[in-house]
Amino acid sequence: MKINVKGVPETMIQTLYARAKETSKENPKIKDEMAVSIVKQLDYDFSEANEDRTMSLGVIARTIVLDKMVEEYLNTHKDTIVINIACGLDTRCYRMKGKYVRWYNLDLPETINIRKQFLKETGPIYQIAKSAMDESYRDDIQYHGENILVIIEGLTMYLSENDIKKMFSIIDFKNSTVMVEVMLPFVVKHIKEKSIEGSRAQFTWGIKNGKELEKLTPSFSFLKEVSLVEGMKQLMPIYHVLGKIPFVSHVSNKIIVLEKHI
């Protein structure tokens, strides 16, 4: 199946390929058989993604870290609705099946149109074809006071500060927890990924830490942050040593956890 996407939406194809490639290894650190299946159906030039080791390692490290964080949350919050913002072709909802009440995959209409071709989701997994900055998406969520877990990965680095503020202002459910991936401003400015540049997507925004993000989103409280170095430790043992160097941990992308209680 041939697909034609450019810019930020194209990054979902590259991250999908990274997960499929890792899954196909003899001793994979993650297992995403659905990614393998989708990649086999795609008529797409994966050469740049195949050669971009930096991007691939980052995607797998992020998957390792977020899978662990999401599963731990769901294991202790049985009554939870998950909102996966900028879902792309993410398949975490299937790896976590049975641990949540409902799961909403939200992304731009062009992305959801592609997702629908491979993943038929009609409950308890649902699709919402809207922007994270479109407050009307809240009307598409069946909500009766359950815990809300919002996952935002691979998105904030392509937004503006105003976008970030808008996106968080829309998340006004009570008892909301947000797990959001962020990039350091230094990395936004100086680090390039071959496959990302090839898609014409550009990094545009970064933030130093969770406390700084809390200042931008005053209705949320900073809880903790986890460096993707924790995932890299499973991929490359040398990171058990490198991770102790403050600069290495600092410069890596992080998953920041914020909470809102109304």
Residue ranges and their predicted role:
Residues 200-230:
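Short alpha-helix
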Residues 172-185:
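Conserved beta-strand signature within the Rossmann-like core of class I S-adenosyl-L-methionine
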Residues 185-201:
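Short, glycine-/aromatic-enriched active-site segment of Class I SAM-dependent methyltransferases
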Residues 1-83, 87-130, 143-144:
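Rossmann-like AdoMet
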Residues 136-145:
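Short amphipathic alpha-helix with an adjacent loop that forms part of the alpha/beta core around
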Residues 148-162:
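A short SAM/SAH-binding and catalytic strip from SAM-dependent methyltransferases
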Residues 158-173:
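A short, conserved alpha-helix within the catalytic core of class I
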Residues 231, 235-262:
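Core SAM-dependent methyltransferase catalytic element
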